[in-house]
């Protein structure tokens, strides 16, 4: 499979210089006179597969966008194996610039033809890194000064970040062969070289969001009292210093101190800073919303109410999100282990040779965690504990670190896989450690509104019923009733189930390279929590939250997650 019509490939002809005259071949233009063998590497992205969904395949692929498939340079290492098939320090290849790739175009596809001169024919292991990091370039260009070959040094190397993933920058996506590549170089015919195909994959992963409802607005029905405030509106108040603020959740009431004239009550926070306003005929700017004036002192009042059947048709608009536990490091080449976490290997496929898990540089340490009430800043950025403690109510403030605006249109990918929320790195722990404190998850913030989507302001929950005023709470449940406060009508939904292969006995809640994890919220059964409250050692406490996943790999392996709250 070509990535976006580009053959991510390089025809690397290795002219093996012979030691005897018997190996001399006809000398054509630009051909070496003495060769042991010629090798052509055809390097491309993995082709599509019709296999059933598993830890390597998902049933769906996506070509990605242009910047995710561009090749600017490469490191190719060929390590000559000894008679026992072991790596040696006899290596060829190295760092190749764009110019050194000798770019050509054939049938609309880009092909690269770099040349190498090798000393011997025989068996070689091949490691291909497209768009390598500076540290990998340094290894490739260095003199051999350690006990390990360049092949081993690069394959065992890792990349670490604090959030700005440079190996996922446009035109700089690092890609590495997924399988161990061995080739027996035999041909000494320049026109008919030994050919070996190499599949490469991106080292990073991607989390996307598909918009299921226009403007991310979801209808739902909530339980409430048998009466409800008859009218709620929004408007503007102008402070004495001319600062204008928008007030939501202004409830219409009778002013009992002034012949039952209309007054609008704003609950404030927890009902402790209630204020009363008078609606004027003036409107604010181009909004069409009325300007309100403050009424002091605060009057005795009685809400206008209407009878209900104990239910209200409301909406939840998802407006913010925060990804949690984004891994800060990844190996350059695939690292894998079996179910026991005792036998490790570099390069290969899950499900082959008893390989059960991918491995990231922090996997072993995460597997040893017993105290989950930590931020784990050495493993993650956007660590769950830090996001959990964040003050989200002012998420639009410049000081807000974790929460971002949830997209309302697919503007950076496509309709199938949605809008990219983030590129990320592998995050893998053994099955029994796949708990919220250690797996990658997501928190959504919702804005509660009436059936039209208009915010209802601060609301209250008591005995699984929802109220728009504290008076209604106490009238229905007694003066001493305890309740949850949804400040400004905000609620929160959390899921730790960004799954790789849902229900798998190993790679269930995991992030794996070259996969797109597509999140789609299909609906709600209830309003989320008033605050972000997550048990780091257990599952979500919201029993109305459901998550489903299907998946697929290369060019990007797409794994769909349908979420119902």
Per-region residue spans from a language model:
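Sec-type signal peptide cleavage vicinity
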Residues: 2-6, 18-565
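Bacterial Sec-type N-terminal signal peptides, specifically the leucine/valine-rich hydrophobic h-region
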Residues: 13-16
């Amino acid at each position: 499979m070509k990535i976006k019509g580009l053959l991510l490939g390089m025809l690397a002809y290795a002219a093996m210089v012979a030691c005897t005259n018997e190996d001399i071949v006809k000398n054509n233009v630009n051909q070496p006179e003495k060769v042991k063998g010629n090798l052509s590497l055809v390097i491309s992205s993995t082709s599509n597969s019709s296999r059933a969904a598993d830890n390597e395949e998902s049933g769906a692929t996506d070509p990605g966008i242009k910047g995710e498939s561009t090749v600017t340079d490469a490191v190719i290492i060929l390590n000559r194996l000894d008679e026992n098939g072991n790596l040696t320090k006899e290596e060829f290849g190295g760092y190749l610039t764009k110019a050194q790739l000798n770019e050509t175009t054939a049938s609309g596809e880009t092909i690269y033809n770099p040349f190498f001169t090798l000393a011997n024919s025989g068996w070689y292991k091949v490691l291909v890194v497209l768009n390598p990091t500076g540290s990998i370039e340094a290894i490739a260009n260095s003199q051999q000064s350690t006990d390990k070959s360049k092949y081993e040094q690069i394959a065992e190397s890792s990349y670490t970040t604090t959030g700005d993933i440079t190996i996922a920058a446009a035109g700089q996506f690092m890609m590495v062969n997924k399988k161990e590549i061995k080739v027996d170089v035999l041909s000494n015919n320049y026109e008919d070289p030994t050919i070996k195909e190499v599949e490469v994959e991106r080292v990073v992963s991607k989390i996307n969001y598909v918009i299921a409802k226009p403007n991310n607005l979801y209808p739902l029905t909530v339980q409430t009292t048998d009466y409800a405030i008859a009218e709620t509106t929004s408007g503007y108040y102008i402070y004495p210093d001319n600062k204008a603020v928008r007030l939501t959740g202004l409830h219409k009431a009778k002013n009992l101190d002034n012949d039952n004239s209309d007054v609008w009550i704003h609950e404030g926070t927890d009902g402790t800073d209630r204020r009363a306003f008078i609606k004027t005929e003036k409107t604010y700017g181009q909004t069409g919303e009325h300007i309100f004036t403050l009424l002091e002192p605060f009057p005795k009042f009685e809400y206008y109410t209407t009878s209900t059947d104990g239910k209200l048709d409301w909406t939840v608009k998802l407006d913010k999100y925060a990804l949690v536990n984004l891994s800060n490091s990844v190996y350059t080449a695939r690292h894998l282990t079996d179910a026991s976490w005792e036998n490790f290997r570099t390069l290969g496929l899950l499900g082959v040779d008893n390989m059960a898990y991918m491995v990231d540089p922090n996997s072993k340490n995460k597997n040893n965690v017993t105290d989950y009430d930590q931020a784990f800043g050495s493993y993650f950025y956007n660590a769950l504990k830090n996001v959990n403690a964040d003050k989200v109510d002012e998420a639009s403030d410049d000081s807000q670190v974790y929460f971002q605006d949830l997209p309302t249109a697919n503007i950076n990918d496509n309709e199938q896989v949605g809008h990219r929320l983030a590129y990320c790195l592998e995050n893998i722990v053994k099955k029994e450690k796949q708990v919220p404190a250690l797996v990658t998850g997501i928190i959504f913030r919702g804005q509660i509104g009436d059936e039209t989507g208009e915010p209802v302001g601060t609301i209250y929950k008591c005995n699984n019923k929802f109220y728009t005023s504290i008076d209604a709470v106490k009238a229905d449940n007694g003066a001493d009733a305890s309740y949850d406060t949804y400040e400004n009508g905000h609620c929160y939904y959390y899921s730790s189930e960004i799954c790789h292969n849902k229900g798998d006995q190993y790679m269930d809640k995991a992030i794996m390279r070259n996969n797109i994890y597509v999140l789609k919220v299909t609906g709600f059964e209830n309003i989320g929590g008033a605050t972000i409250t997550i048990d780091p050692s257990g599952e979500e406490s919201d029993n109305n939250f459901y998550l489903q996943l299907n998946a697929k790999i290369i060019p990007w392996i797409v794994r769909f997650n349908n979420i119902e709250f």
